[in-house]
Each structure stands twice: as C-alpha cells, then as structure tokens.
C-alpha cells in the first residue's frame, strides 16, 4: 500500500513508529503538499469573484500551479521512501564486502536527491503564496500566510534530509553541490516566507 493512500491517522502512526519509512523526507513532502493545497484554497475562494476580475487570469494560473505542486509533493512522499529502501539495504552489506562503498555512494546520492526536489517544490510553493497574498481574496489571505509558513517548515525539513545523506558521501564534490543548492534555497525562500507572514500580520492587526 502506498504511503499516500494511508489515512492521515495511519500515516501518523507509521511516522511515529520505529519503521524506517515514512521519515523526515516524507513528512516534509506531505507538509509541502498541504501548503500547496492552501494555495489552491485561496484560488478557489478568489476565482470568479467580480471584485477580483482584474486578476482572474493570474488566479487561474496560480490554481494550476498549486494543483501541480500539490500532486508532485504527494508523489514525493512515496518517492522518498522508495529512495531510502536501497540505502537501508546497503547499510546491511558487510563493511568488507567488495563494492559496498560504491553501492553506498550511489544510494546516498539517490536518497539525497528526493528531499532536494522536495525543497525545490516547497520553494515554489512559498513564491506562489507571495503572489496569492497580494492578489487573493481578502477572506483567504490568512491561508496564503499559513501556506507560506507551512512550506517554510517543509523546506527546512527537506534540507535537513539532504544533509543527513550528503554528510556520509565520500564524493565531497557531489555532496557539496547538493548542499550548496539546498543552502541557496534556504537562504532565499525562508526569508521570503517570513516576509509573507509578517506582511499578513502587520496588515491584519486589531484596531
């Protein structure tokens, strides 16, 4: 049974168990998908409203983007588990076995690649929420801010799961390239998510 086909409660039970998967990468992907879904909600509450007719085409474009990101991140929940499976098997290979180091290296690269993709998707979600905060229905801007905050956490979680694999790689050039990409996403999009949330909070103070 695919992880994404589990109920929310079943997924949480698996996540809280001693099972190897789902883990941090899968949780990051699911959180990112939830953030994208919040963007979809903003679009659904804005589309077709006379008050927002001037941005209708933008909202329809953003709705398609939100749906695409949501679907991609949901796929990543199981993709992360699938990438970890061969790594778990590689750990079981005797340390003096021929070819173990090469197998480990290949599996570590694969296990790092998925959370990096998750991080990239979460960055796109954050960028989308910036536009939705500006153009979405006033009744739903809290959902854009919530989506940005949730995607920020998912981005950080995904980056952590890149690092847990790259730190063990022998090919330090490859590891550094992956780490640099993850760090660049954190440096650009965490502050953007913070600004989105702060802008929402400042514009919606009491009095």
Language model features by range: what are they?
Residues 41-53:
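Transmembrane signal-anchor/signal-peptide helices with a preference for the extracytoplasmic
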Residues 80-149, 153, 158, 165:
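Amphipathic alpha-helical interface segments
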Residues 30-34, 62, 69-76, 111-121, ...:
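Amphipathic alpha-helix face/heptad-repeat signature
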Residues 50-89, 185, 192:
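A structural-propensity feature for long, helix-poor, extended segments
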Residues 1-15, 120-132:
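Acidic-glycine-rich active-site phosphate/pyrophosphate-binding loop
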Residues 17-40, 140-158:
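Conserved phosphate/anionic-ligand binding catalytic regions in large, soluble enzymes, centered on
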Residues 79-94, 193-207:
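Long, charge-rich low-complexity segments
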Residues 125, 140-207:
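Preference for long, well-ordered alpha-helical segments
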């Amino acid at each position: 049974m695919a992880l994404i086909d589990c109920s929310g409660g079943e997924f949480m039970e698996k996540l809280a168990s001693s099972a190897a998967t789902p883990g941090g990468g899968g949780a990051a992907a699911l959180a990112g998908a939830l953030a994208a879904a919040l963007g979809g909600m903003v679009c659904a509450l804005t589309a077709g409203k006379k008050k927002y007719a001037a941005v209708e085409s933008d909202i329809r474009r953003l709705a398609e983007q939100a749906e695409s990101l949501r679907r991609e991140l949901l796929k990543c929940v199981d993709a992360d588990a699938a990438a970890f499976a061969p790594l778990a098997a590689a750990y079981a290979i005797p340390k003096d076995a021929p070819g173990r180091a090469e197998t480990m290296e290949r599996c570590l690269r694969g296990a790092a690649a998925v959370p990096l993709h998750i991080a990239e998707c979460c960055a796109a979600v954050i960028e989308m929420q910036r536009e939705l905060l500006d153009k979405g229905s006033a009744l739903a801007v809290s959902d854009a801010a919530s989506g940005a905050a949730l995607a920020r956490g998912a981005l950080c979680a995904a980056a952590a799961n890149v690092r847990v694999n790259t730190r063990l790689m022998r090919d330090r050039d490859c590891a550094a390239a992956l780490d640099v990409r993850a760090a660049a996403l954190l440096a650009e999009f965490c502050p953007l998510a913070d600004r989105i949330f702060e802008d929402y909070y400042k514009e919606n103070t009491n009095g």
